[in-house]
A protein has these predicted regions:
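Conserved phosphate-binding elements of NTP-dependent enzyme cores
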Residues: 1-745
Length: 748
């Protein structure tokens, strides 16, 4: 019996001809430093080959309609099962997705309310639950004799026939925010006081407004209430005006209809066709819960059926842990003949919900917008969705499943992985958390360093064996035998000596009113079990409140008070990937590339050849490679197969034309370098090459200090992991000079 996957000659990213056997039907953990090749082995080899080979078994017709992965750079991979990957950063769902739709728990609830509810007749009388609904028979009201059909599960869906007509099933309505229409009331209308008329409407609207009887040459604050009412809500009357064109200085007589400021925004919103157009309009809008459905997204008819005295929207507001108890009591509340059907529906609900409860998501309600969930919550939703079908013979590749998990929630995660193995599957996970690594059956450690210094298997065995292996770098930290060094903490008596940021909020989501104080000039950590309110406190309250206060806007509705003296900027540094543009590199994002271009433009070679700093841009400059247009690679369209990306045959991935090599920068140590030479170096080597360039050296040193010395300057940012992206964003901020305007910054 085959008991392992054989990998021979793996060369994905920085892997150096790796030969390794990965046990099947076990939990296998891949550990190592950031950039050591963990994800390259797990996702770039195991998942890529497992999924590709499964897809190749499908017909050509089917494969042409699917996104296919290219063959991994590996000599041989034997005995790899069909693979599923749970990525580190699941995509942020759209506005129509909720926790209930994402987990598909709402499907069971809609079926429950369709088949088992007390339904309301057209005259408002409720009928007791009956099997006639499941049989598709008409119902007759015993009180008024009205005949009607109970709603189907489809008619209870807010993304379909059950949607609220006012908000179209989104639960929110966009209305014009009057406070944004005149941001500076010291200006006159002629000077552009009415903002929508400047960006969304023709400039002649000020002339029409004047004909409506509004003074346009006095500050807006001095207008009468009647004049302001005309500006905001005036009637759409046609006026005869004399329009003076600013370009031709000619006057023209026109008949033009007056569009008040509010209607100008509403009209522009109705015509929005793309994201760019929406951005022009959204600054004049505010969101509020739909007044008709109260934010439930459901129509009045979809909210009518009741089970155990509650409607669908009411049970969707319950935390999942409470909802499970409520669902368990449904069969007993029904007539005897309906209980078998009720038990079947409730068992289906409970089976899916159990996985989510095991993963610590019992505090979430089904109506919670999926876009407001944290990364860890979305990843656990993804994990629960993948494991609920009880498949067998599948390879599950998990990329840092412990992200966002409190140590107390890790037991549930490990239990889910053990259940997968018990069902005959194999689990490969990439992680840094020693508590998760200790639960694995087998460990493979990559290293010894990162980037070019990594890509090798330095140790493998059981966690206990690695803890005693002198070649292992993570071994000493397993089973609590060692701990990472800690920085000295500020003393309690001086903790708030540099000032305080004070915040208080009302209830939001499942989080009760909060009050918190953050010391200025200190490193503050917000921690707690999943669902305790970390994201709500920081990302949904503190950050937007600071941004609004700095911009002079009203605080978010749920923020009661904010006291942040001296804070003039707030920077959010999260772990979301840095775009999808291959033209973005480590050098450009870390603000190094511009400095290098200026340096090379000052060289004698550049002056002799007539090159300016702009010519050294691989995106738009004269020296970019004409074959690949500065991307460093070209895409080959292969019929019936996935597109193949290969290094550009002319520049060999350097992004520059051969003429760029003729411009040399001479360091004080006598060495000369071209810009393509520097872009091919990793940060560690570039530090010594750029030792004479103060600004470049400082910014590269920050990257080195943050453990990113293994990245090459020309590395594409979309290829970076979430942790690497976060550290690069941090380096980008730390590399900026701390001028007076930057002292009042809050970094989150």
């Amino acid at each position: 019996m085959i008991d392992h996957i054989e990998i021979r000659g793996a060369r994905v990213h920085n892997l150096k001809n790796v030969d390794v056997d990965v046990p099947l039907h076990q939990i296998v953990a891949i550990a190592g430093l950031s950039g050591s090749g963990k994800s390259s082995l797990a996702l770039g080899v195991l998942y890529a080959e497992g999924s590709r080979r499964y897809l190749e078994a499908l017909s050509t017709y089917t494969r042409r309609r699917m996104t296919q992965a290219a063959k991994a750079q590996v000599d041989e991979v034997l005995y790899v099962p069909a693979a599923l990957a749970l990525h580190q950063r699941p995509g942020v769902p759209g506005m129509r997705s909720t926790f209930g739709t994402g987990t598909e728990l709402l499907n069971s609830l809609r079926l429950l309310f369709s088949r088992l509810a007390s339904h309301r007749c057209p005259n408002g009388h409720y009928l007791p639950p009956t099997l006639a609904v499941a049989a598709g028979q008409a119902l007759t009201c015993p009180q008024c004799g009205a005949t009607f059909y109970a709603p189907s599960a489809e008619e209870l869906a807010f993304n379909s026939q059950g949607a609220c007509r006012t908000c179209d099933g989104t639960g929110i309505v966009r209305t014009v925010d009057l406070s944004t229409l005149v941001p500076d009331d010291s200006l006159t209308i002629d000077e552009g006081a009415v903002a929508p008329w400047n960006s969304l409407m023709w400039s002649l609207m000020t002339d029409v407004c004047r004909e409506m009887g509004v003074r346009t040459d006095v500050p807006f604050r001095e207008l009468s209430d009647r004049e302001k009412e005309i500006v905001f809500h005036g009637p759409a009357e046609k006026k005869h005006i004399l329009y003076h064109s600013k370009k031709t200085e000619q006057a023209t007589e026109l008949d033009f209809t007056y569009y008040n400021a509010v209607y100008t925004v509403e009209n522009a919103l109705a015509k929005v066709k793309d994201e760019k157009g929406m951005k022009r309009v959204e600054k004049f809008l505010k969101q509020a819960p739909c007044p008709d459905c109260g934010g439930s997204r459901l129509s009045e008819a979809a909210r009518a059926p009741k089970v155990r005295g509650l409607s669908l929207d009411e049970v969707c507001r319950m935390p999942l842990s409470e909802l499970c108890e409520w669902v368990a009591g449904v069969p007993a509340s029904l007539p005897e003949e309906m209980r078998p059907m009720a038990e079947s529906i409730c068992e289906a609900f409970a089976g899916v919900a159990k996985r989510l409860l095991d993963l610590g998501l019992g505090y979430l309600s089904l109506d919670r917008a999926a876009s407001t969930l944290s990364t860890g919550e979305r990843q656990r939703m993804q994990l629960a969705r993948a494991v609920r079908n009880r498949t067998t013979g599948v390879l599950y590749v998990l990329d840092e499943p412990s992200i966002g998990l409190h140590p107390s929630n890790l037991v549930g995660l490990c239990g889910v992985m053990q259940d997968l193995v018990a069902d005959g599957n194999s689990v490969v996970l990439v992680d840094h958390d020693t508590q998760v690594l200790e639960q694995s059956d087998w460990m493979i450690e990559m290293g010894p360093g990162a980037g070019a210094d990594g890509g090798r298997v330095i140790a493998q065995g059981t966690p206990r064996e690695l803890s005693k292996n002198p070649a292992s770098k993570i071994g000493p930290f397993l089973f609590g035998e060692n701990s990472a060094p800690m920085r000295p903490r500020a003393k309690q008596e001086t903790l708030f000596s540099q000032g305080t940021i004070a915040l208080s909020t009302s209830q939001l989501h499942t989080v009760k009113p909060l009050s918190a104080q953050f010391p200025k000039g200190r490193l503050t950590v917000v921690t707690g079990v999943s669902g305790s309110g970390k994201t709500t406190l920081v990302l949904e309250s503190l950050v937007p409140a600071l941004q609004d206060q700095i911009a002079g806007k009203p605080l978010p509705p749920h923020v009661k008070a904010l006291d942040a003296p001296g804070i003039r900027q707030v920077k959010l540094i999260d772990a979301t990937p840095i775009g999808i543009n291959v033209r973005s590199t480590v050098a450009t994002y870390a603000n190094v590339h511009d400095e290098l271009r200026k340096t090379f433009a000052k060289t004698a070679d550049a002056k002799r050849l007539g090159y300016k700093a702009g010519d050294f841009s691989y995106n738009t400059g004269r020296l970019r490679c004409p074959t690949c247009d500065g991307t460093g690679e070209i895409s080959l369209d292969v019929q019936f197969l996935p597109d193949v990306n290969i290094p550009c045959p002319q520049c060999r991935g350097a992004r520059y034309a051969k003429e760029a090599a003729a411009v040399r920068y001479e360091a004080k140590n006598g060495q000369t370098y071209s810009l393509p030479d520097l872009m091919a170096m990793d940060v560690h080597d570039a530090l010594s090459a750029c030792a004479d360039l103060k600004v470049v050296r400082q910014r590269l040193q920050v990257l080195e200090d943050l453990g990113l010395g293994y990245l090459t300057l020309g590395e594409e940012t979309p290829r970076l992991s979430g942790g690497e992206a976060q550290r690069l964003k941090l380096a980008s901020e730390m590399g900026k000079s701390q001028s007076d305007s930057q002292i009042g910054r809050a970094h989150v």
